[in-house]
């Protein structure tokens, strides 16, 4: 029987999830400095779990340590984006292929839930919708390790999506819905080649 999580572990995970969400949604902007004392005051929690959470964020490549200065949200580096996009493409295509080979009829039918985007014009809602669609496919690929890695990469794309949309002259988000419908249509039709091609 597994023991219950220690309070410090729970606090660390709570802080980690909060800061991770703020980074991925660009509420903490690329290049923004983070100080332990400021986070202690803002989150109302002791320094130890905050330090643990910051260490985990550094390990995930979301922040960097600046000796004697504190922590900084990592900048979005063009070469890093290119590498991440290539990795995501490989992972998502494999997830689609495996899902089409192994998923039940019910799992495939539930893809239709993503055919219509949320009515809210709120950007975070749309980003949640986009992430939920892609992580659903990953979660049902039948390979737990692949799913875990793919979902982490997909979630890290949230802030890239946020930056690309908000910096574009065209703020239309209809492309998410259109792309999802095309992928869903190909999967439901059993056209693996087309579904994989659309993932790119």
Roles of regions detected by a PLM:
Residues 22, 27, 117-121, 138, ...:
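Hydrophobic side-chain positions on well-ordered alpha-helices
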Residues 1-101:
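Short linear motifs at protein or domain termini
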Residues 50, 108, 112, 147-154, ...:
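Short, well-structured alpha-helical segments
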Residues 7, 164-200:
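C-terminal all-alpha effector/ligand-binding and dimerization domain
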Residues 13, 89, 105, 109-112, ...:
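Amphipathic alpha-helical repeat elements characteristic of tetratricopeptide repeat
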Residues 107-125, 180:
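Amphipathic alpha-helical segments enriched in hydrophobic/aromatic residues interleaved with Lys/Arg
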Residues 87-102, 132-170:
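Hydrophobic, amphipathic alpha-helical faces that serve as interaction scaffolds
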